[in-house]
Every structure is written in structure tokens, then in C-alpha cells.
Amino acid sequence: MRQQILGAASWQIHHGFRNLVYNQLLMLKLYLIRHGETDWNAEGRIQGHSDVELNERGLEQARRLAARMPEEGPFDAIYASPLRRAFRTAELIGQSLGLPVIGDARLLERSLGMLEGLTMNDIKEKFPEVHHAWHEGGTRPHIPGEETREAFVRRTSEFIHDVRAKHHEGRVLAVTHGGTINMLLLTGLNLDVERPLPFHIDNASINIVQWGERGARLRLLNDTCHLNALFVGAGGALEPYAEQKITAAEVQ
């Protein structure tokens, strides 16, 4: 009896290990990374398609991302939004991983037309109905010059489809924007794309969607542990990253 039990346990361990290896081989992980901070982020300004550069803090965030990513394992490809804040973040990561960066316009942030460059206080004054809808709920009016939600959903869905078709397994990295990461998560996880964007995504954060035999899973959300170090504050003093505040955190 003891030998039978040991034999059954040995078979279960072997079978479980074999399934683990099999699932690992068939697993695709998509790392969605938000760009480092810009001055407009720090000022709480809407960015959208506006091509704002990383500030010094954002560059340091990108360097810390670049130092962390080799620990995550080998990557097969790096894709990035063509906007400078995302592409520069991706370049630093690419240098660390020894991979070129592939620009992809489908990773652009959603254009918000006439709202770009404005703070929440500006929007409250100039577009009160938009401000009310964002903060109180309800349907907001059309913003002149904005990208439609339908177009936004379509391009992010196409990106997910193409990545999964090209990379059946392994790790792929995409450096993009807060709003775009939200929509990529919704489409990648087969969630309702008509709902308000639900996820808080910090600058230089890591988010992981995994596809395997059991479908799509969210494995990591808004991880910034690589930023838990000292930064130089506005007055020149060193401050803990966790204590620094970014106004209007929902601004992408």
C-alpha cells in the first residue's frame, strides 16, 4: 500500500511538473508599461497626442525600469508609442535588453483635442459639462478634435490581436500611455470597453496580461516597486518617491 501511495504521488508530481512546463511554453506575457513622468504630468495637464518630453524625474524612472526589466527574463520584442515620452522610455529599456524598439501608432494615447494642455481647473472653467461628467458620472459631450472611443477601441484591439498572432509564447513589452494601457487591458481581458477607464496607472508602472490554456489573466497591475528609492525633490533635497504627489493623477 505504501508503495502504491508513493507511486501515485510520484506520478502526480511528474504530471503536474509536465503540465507546468507545457503551460509555460504556451504562455504569452504582454508587459504594458507607462512612460516616465513629464512636466505636464507633474502639472496635471492633459497630454493626449501632444508630444511632451520626459522630465528629469521621468528619465530617472525610465532608467530604473531599464535596470529592472532584465530580471523579468528574456523578451522577444519591444513596441512603443511614437510619442517622445513613451519612445524614449522604451529606448532606455531596449538598451538594457539589447532589443530595438518598434514604433507602433496604435499605442498612441487617445487624442483629446481641445482639452490637451489644460489642467482640471482649466477644464472646469472652459468645459464645465466635461468636467462634471468626468467627476460625477454620466455621458460627457463631444470634445472638439478628440479621437472617438470607437476608433480608440478599434486600434487597441487590433494591436492585441496582432501581438497574439505574431507572438504565441514568451514575453513582449509595450511602452505606452495611461489611457491606452486601460483600453489594452479591457480589450485583452475581454472586459466591457464602453465602461469608464477603471485602472489607475502610474508613470513608469508595469502591468502584465498573460494568455495561456485558461484564457487571459491579469498577472500584475500598476507595479512601481522599482521606484522605491530616493529622488531629488524640487528644492534639491532627497525625498522618498512614495511621498511625492502628482496632481490630477488621472491625467494620462
Q: What would you call each of these model-derived segments?
A:
Residues 15-16:
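Short hydrophobic alpha-helical segments enriched in small aliphatic residues
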Residues 27, 87, 95, 157-217:
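Active-site-adjacent alpha-helix immediately C-terminal to a catalytic or transition-state-stabilizing loop
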Residues 64-131, 251-252:
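Phosphate-coordination/substrate-recognition cap region in phosphate-metabolizing enzymes
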Residues 219-252:
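Acidic, His/Gly-rich catalytic cores of divalent-metal-dependent hydrolytic chemistry
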